[in-house]
């Protein structure tokens, strides 16, 4: 007779795992910050990956990496399809959770000590995050005011006018974030010709997408082509505070077509919204600053520990938290804890 398996009481992803996932990104950020400014992006990424993978092992869940460091044969850990979470006792099954990770967004930024490097994850119930291939994705990202106003097939000038109208501004008032890449030369020229201003960034279109959808960040939209995995993570964040996004995979080779089909995507030319990319009913998004940025402070070390700054958001419960944490590596002694 086969053993009867006991399934742990169903969990609320948002209620029961938010604190655990905040801890995961904090551990990755602390580890990668130790490599900041050392000029070795690979070492920075490896530090974040190892710390994140180890932190997952303490969580009572059957986690499934749906977006990670690459295919199984190309990544030693946090690869697509890897199972993460604590090993359950015999006869017990932990609840299943889909997880998307970018252990260190902006590896070059961390290696150079420049702003906006972050450690990121998103999680949902199974099926709540698109299994996106590791390819490029065309994106336009803006705030909640631009709901249903963006058209990825329309000219750049049309979308700029639409964004300006939604924000009650002139096009010349807008600041658009674009990745500084040769492939964006024509896009940059069109934005300038329309009269909008541009903020070029070296890396980090995920953090840029979040900033563009938040009021008071000084930017109004993101245009251009970046990574598809980062697009799904951005969509998870946007779902939590109703940001707007339209996107489409860039599938321009036979190899990519086959990879997209293997991942269950039947229409490679489909235009996605944030809801399409992150359709879950329960979504967690967590990001911890590595270097200082527009939204998050980087990790700050002191003699007996460090301080982290984390953005933690949930979709169903509609919560956006900025978590300021002091980590004490040992007894603080006579120093105590500094508030600011």
Q: Language-model segments: which ranges?
A:
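A glycine- and small-aliphatic-rich helix-loop capping segment at beta-alpha/alpha-beta transitions
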Residues: 83-87, 115-129, 216-218, 239-243
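A generic local secondary-structure boundary/capping motif
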Residues: 86-90, 107-112, 163-168, 188, ...
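General beta-strand structural signal in soluble alpha/beta enzymes
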Residues: 65-69, 99-101, 110-112, 131-132, ...
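DPxDG-like acidic metal-binding loop motif
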Residues: 94-105, 109-130
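Acidic beta-strand-loop-alpha-helix segment within the catalytic core
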Residues: 120-201, 263-266, 293-300, 304-339
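N-terminal subdomain of lithium-sensitive/metallo-dependent phosphomonoesterases centered on the IMPase/IPPase/PAP
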Residues: 2-100, 165, 206-207, 211, ...
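Helical "lid/coupling" subdomains associated with nucleotide-phosphate turnover
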Residues: 8, 191, 202, 211-216, ...
């Amino acid at each position: 007779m086969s053993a009867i398996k006991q399934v742990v009481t169903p969990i609320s992803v948002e209620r029961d795992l938010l604190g655990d996932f905040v801890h995961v990104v904090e551990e990755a950020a602390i580890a990668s910050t130790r490599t900041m400014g050392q000029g070795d992006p690979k070492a920075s990424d490896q530090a974040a990956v190892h710390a994140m993978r180890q932190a997952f092992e303490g969580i009572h869940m059957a986690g499934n990496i749906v977006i990670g460091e690459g295919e199984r044969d190309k990544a030693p850990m946090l690869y697509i399809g890897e199972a993460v979470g604590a090993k359950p006792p015999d006869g017990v099954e932990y609840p299943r959770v889909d997880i998307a990770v970018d252990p260190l967004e902006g590896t070059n930024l961390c290696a150079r000590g420049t702003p906006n490097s972050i450690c990121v994850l998103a999680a949902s119930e199974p099926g709540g995050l698109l299994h996106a291939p590791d390819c490029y994705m065309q994106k336009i990202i803006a705030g909640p005011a631009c709901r249903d106003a963006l058209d990825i097939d329309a000219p750049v000038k049309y979308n700029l006018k639409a964004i300006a109208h939604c924000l009650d501004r002139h096009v010349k008032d807008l600041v658009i974030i674009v990745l500084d890449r040769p492939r964006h030369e024509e896009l940059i020229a069109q934005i300038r010709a329309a009269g909008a201003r541009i903020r070029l960034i070296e890396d980090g279109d995920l953090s840029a997408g979040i900033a563009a959808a938040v009021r008071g960040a000084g930017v109004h939209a993101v245009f251009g082509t970046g990574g598809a995995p980062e697009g799904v993570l951005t969509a998870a964040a946007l779902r939590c505070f109703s940001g707007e996004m339209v996107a489409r995979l860039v599938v321009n080779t036979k190899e990519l077509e086959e990879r997209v089909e293997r991942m269950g995507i039947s229409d490679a030319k489909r235009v996605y919204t944030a809801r399409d990319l992150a359709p879950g009913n329960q979504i967690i998004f967590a990001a911890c600053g590595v270097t200082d940025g527009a939204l998050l402070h980087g990790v700050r070390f002191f003699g007996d520990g460090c301080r982290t700054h984390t953005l933690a958001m949930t979709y169903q419960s509609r919560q956006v938290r900025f978590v300021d944490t002091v980590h004490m590596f040992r007894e603080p002694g006579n120093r105590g804890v500094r508030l600011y």
